[in-house]
């Protein structure tokens, strides 16, 4: 399984001849190396409904006939826009032809904000994502605060790589993320959701230096690891 990072919370997985994107915020993302018009994708996994995570989902899904796997309310909202969706919910798992997906808790919000009409649409509970293929497991924490049940996620799953937000302000910051890394017990931890905007500026190298009992890896946009 090849896993690459593409800025903010964008993660690409290549496995079993399939390409999976998590939270494809490409257009308007100053930290990504990807352009929506160039992306080929078979499935899109969404952690929650905020614009910096849903991103280019509708365009990508329609262009590639890709399935969008998302929490129930968000999946329903996107299906109304003509997208092929597979709704799930927290604690549920499903075996797809590209791998197994399970949604975990995340402590955050989830909504679609229409600035023009000044409306906010609730899009369900936010989630973390466990993805398993080729006997390897990736944990994408989504946007979240530190929470004690991360210990349970670590106890129940043999996590090979975890992507954890470190930006602070909207999510946990580096200090909390160090504790999260300890709790989820991943072999490798990659920081995400930082330096996209001034309010979430952090030094990822300082973060990985503080990690214990795991390998910390800072991935620049386009860099990958193989599990």
From Swiss-Prot:
It comes from the Bacteria. Pfam families: Lactamase_B_2. GO terms for molecular function: hydrolase activity. Keywords: Hydrolase. SUPFAM superfamilies: Metallo-hydrolase/oxidoreductase. PANTHER family: UPF0173 METAL-DEPENDENT HYDROLASE MJ1163 (PTHR43546:SF3), UPF0173 METAL-DEPENDENT HYDROLASE MJ1163-RELATED (PTHR43546). Belongs to the UPF0173 family. NCBIfam families: PRK00685.1 (NF001911). This is UPF0173 metal-dependent hydrolase BA_4860/GBAA_4860/BAS4507.
């Amino acid at each position: 399984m090849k896993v690459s990072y593409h800025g903010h919370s964008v993660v690409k997985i290549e496995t079993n001849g399939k390409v999976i994107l998590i939270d494809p915020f490409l257009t308007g993302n100053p930290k990504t190396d990807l352009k929506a018009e160039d992306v080929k994708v078979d499935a899109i996994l969404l952690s929650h409904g905020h614009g910096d995570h849903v991103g280019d989902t509708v365009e990508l899904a329609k262009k590639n006939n890709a399935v969008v796997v998302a929490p129930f309310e968000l999946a329903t909202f996107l299906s109304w826009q003509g997208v092929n969706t597979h709704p799930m919910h927290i604690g549920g798992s499903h075996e797809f032809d590209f791998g197994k997906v399970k949604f975990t808790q995340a402590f955050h919000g989830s909504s679609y904000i229409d600035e023009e009409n000044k409306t906010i649409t609730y899009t369900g509970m936010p989630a973390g994502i466990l993805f398993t293929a080729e006997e390897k497991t990736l944990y994408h924490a989504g946007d979240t605060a530190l929470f004690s049940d991360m210990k349970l996620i670590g106890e129940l799953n043999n996590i090979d790589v975890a992507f954890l937000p470190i930006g602070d302000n909207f999510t946990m910051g580096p200090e909390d993320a160090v504790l999260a890394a300890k709790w989820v017990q991943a072999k490798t931890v990659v920081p995400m959701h930082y330096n996209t905007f001034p309010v979430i500026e952090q030094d990822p190298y300082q973060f990985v230096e503080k990690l214990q009992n795991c390998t910390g890896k800072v991935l620049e946009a386009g860099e990958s690891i193989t599990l």
